[in-house]
A protein has these predicted regions:
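N-terminal auxiliary segments of SAM/dcSAM-dependent transferases
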Residues: 1-47
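Generic structural signal for well-ordered alpha-helical scaffold segments
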Residues: 75-79, 103
Length: 137
């Protein structure tokens, strides 16, 4: 899976501490492992996505199990035709509540997926590595 530069749409390549495109546009990888590809100047926003309060409220809600039947049903549909070395992209992964579950279940099935989670909330992405070892961007 590859990512595209939000400035020029060329392919980004991961280097040690940055993602860079052939035109030289660079995006720093944060100490916590994520990279922000949003163009704040063009959107007028300084912050994107859920804040810490929203993240904590969602975590509290999800911990009560209300969405576990939904998560299981989505996994059943996902795994029915998932290729052995397939790629799973969770767009809007948040803290990776679904992502970590899908990854562990696919791993248990011997499917060896490449799993990526993307989100616009830096606060969610800061928590994601604690939930599972997914690539973050």
């Amino acid at each position: 899976m590859s990512f595209r530069c939000p400035v020029c749409s060329q392919e980004l390549k991961k280097e040690e501490k940055i993602w860079v495109c052939p035109q030289g546009h660079t995006f720093d990888i944060a100490a916590k492992g994520y990279v922000n590809l949003l163009m704040s100047n063009s959107s007028g926003a300084k912050r994107h996505g859920d804040d810490r309060l929203m993240i904590n409220a969602r975590r509290d809600f999800l911990s009560k199990g209300f969405y576990e039947p939904l998560r299981e049903a989505v996994y059943d549909a996902l795994s029915a035709d998932f290729p052995r070395d397939g790629t799973l992209l969770d767009a809007g992964c948040g803290e990776c509540w679904y992502t970590s579950y899908f990854k562990s279940r696919l791993d248990e099935s011997g499917l060896e997926p490449q799993v990526l989670g993307v989100d616009i909330s830096k606060y969610a992405l800061e928590k994601a590595p604690k939930n599972c070892g997914v690539e973050r961007a």
